[in-house]
Every structure is written in C-alpha cells, then in structure tokens.
Amino acid sequence: SKLFNDFWMEDQGFIERESFGDLRDLVGRPHGEQATITVGPTDVLTTAHNRLRNAGFSQLPVMDGGRLVGIVTEDAIIQFVYGHPELMAAPVEDAMESVFIKLDKTASVNSLVAMLRVQPYAAVLDGEDFVGLITRSDVLNYLRRQV
C-alpha cells in the first residue's frame, strides 16, 4: 500500500528525508539504506525483467560483491534477446551495460542534468561506493520538492 511506502510518502512531500547538500539528495532509493533493487551478474535475464516489471523501473544496478559492475536496462534486454527468446535464460552480465555515466556525489546538479540528456540515468558514487541511481524522474521529484 502506498500509505505505508516511505518512498512514495517522500515523493509526495509527506515525510522529509535527510538532506546532504549533494547528489545524494536526488537518489530515489539509496543503496546504503538497502532500498535499491538490484540484480547480480549471474542472475538470469528473466530475474532482471521480473524485478524491472515489478518495481516499474527501466534500469537496475548490477552488483557483484557490493560493487557496482553494470546496469541492465529494458532496452539492453530487448536488444539482446530480440529474435532469440531463449536468451532470457542468459546471465545478466551478457546483456548489461558496463559503460555508463558515473558521477561523484559532490558533482553539481548542472553536471547531472547535462549527463541525463545523453543517458536516462546516472550512477552516483561516494568514492568507489555505490550510492544509487538518479533518473530523470528523480530530478523532477527533487525539483518539485524545492517549491
């Protein structure tokens, strides 16, 4: 139920999140709070698709031993399996994107917005530690909360 979903409550402005004054303020589901839905590189694409569908997301971080190793997107899965549906049983690492936008948590919102023109998401890092993904929707939610 949305009433008991803290992320929905935050998005609607009913509860306040801790503010850091950096890109962490824009991350919709912080990884450090175990809020990030992820897959592993050896999970099958069917698992990734189910998690994407159930969460209503278009991309998921691929984590290996606590380290961000890639991003799997709906588009990447489609491109990989189109014409070969049996490939839904292939490991995520075969279809994931290994090259993607990464920004340090201290990067400016201007840099983030510029990057989101190229790619619909950016991975935020604190040094080598994965903080979370920021999507265009997260930026819109952040801007709405500024009003």
Question: How would you label these PLM feature ranges?
Answer:
Residues 1-147:
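Tandem CBS (Cystathionine beta-synthase) repeat/Bateman regulatory domains
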